[in-house]
Amino acid sequence: MTILKQMMRKLKNEKIHMTLIDPAAKSPDESAKIAKEAEMAGTDFIMVGGSTDIDERLMDQTVSAIKENTNLKVILFPGSSNMISRHADAIFFMSLLNSSDREFIVGHQVKASKFLSLLGIEKIPMAYLVFSPGMTVGRVGKANLIDSFDRETALSYSLAAQYMGFKLIYFEAGSGAPRPVSEDTISYVKSKINIPLIVGGGIRDPETAMRIALAGADMIVTGSIAEKSNNVYSVLRNIIGKIKSIEIKNSV
């Protein structure tokens, strides 16, 4: 079964939590330790990547270390065409739709496509939208930031992504953002699309995660909170416990 199908099946019964690990922030061994504690806490998938350009060697080392120490599927979350590892299970083949730079919309994707065709990893088409404040990814990706409360612009991009055939949409406030994308925007967009919505950035406590999930996020991503914590298991267990407690009434 493909990872995308696993996600869709799981979403019929529960929300999904993914832990994002940035190889630029931690050594491969440290990344593996975070992933192991995240697995024990109940995370569903590990994402590896970030907005800082990282070479293939470091990506390989990090993904391999995580695979050796956990039973979780690893999904690449690349910031450029260099951030690919043959050891991963899948890649979010993503387009930063609100970038002002063609490279982040389709350029890096074109550069990586031939190499990816040689690898046995799953490619998951995903639309990536960066909201204010954007943080590093907004700057590096030259994003025309969407205001967190501008639900009409968010909806226009999201519907365009759905009509173009993307399988997932990711709302990003930026790693380390002081707050996540507005719950009103999430709820409004989710009510009008029929593909899964991922939300990340600014989610660092159980209460915030719960609000974002209840607003309509199908998948919650946390990254910085795990990187900075001395007790990854405890921090993530509280967050994951909250979102997993939500009763699913309508399947995606």
Curated annotation (Swiss-Prot):
Enzyme Commission number? 2.5.1.41
Sites where the protein binds sn-glycerol 1-phosphate: Y170, F171, E172, A173, G174, S175, G176, G201, G202, G223, S224
Q: In which pathway does it act?
A: Membrane lipid metabolism; glycerophospholipid metabolism
What is its EC class? Answer: transferase
| GO BP, sorted A to Z | glycerophospholipid biosynthetic process
InterPro entries referenced in this protein's UniProt entry, alphabetically? GGGP/HepGP_synthase_I, GGGP/HepGP_synthase_sf, GGGP_HepGP_synthase, GGGP_synth
Q: Can you tell me which residues bind Mg(2+)?
A: D22, S51
Q: List the disulfide bonds.
A: none
| Cofactor(s) demanded | Mg(2+)
Q: Name one GO cellular component term.
A: cytoplasm
Localization: Cytoplasm
Q: Which residue positions does the secretion signal occupy?
A: none
Q: A GO molecular function for this record?
A: phosphoglycerol geranylgeranyltransferase activity
- Please explain the role this protein plays, according to its UniProt record: Prenyltransferase that catalyzes the transfer of the geranylgeranyl moiety of geranylgeranyl diphosphate (GGPP) to the C3 hydroxyl of sn-glycerol-1-phosphate (G1P). This reaction is the first ether-bond-formation step in the biosynthesis of archaeal membrane lipids.
Family, similarity comment: Belongs to the GGGP/HepGP synthase family. Group II subfamily.
Q: Which NCBIfam families match?
A: GGGP, GGGP-family, PRK04169.1-2
Name the chain's protein.
Geranylgeranylglyceryl phosphate synthase
- The organism named in the record is Thermoplasma volcanium (strain ATCC 51530 / DSM 4299 / JCM 9571 / NBRC 15438 / GSS1)
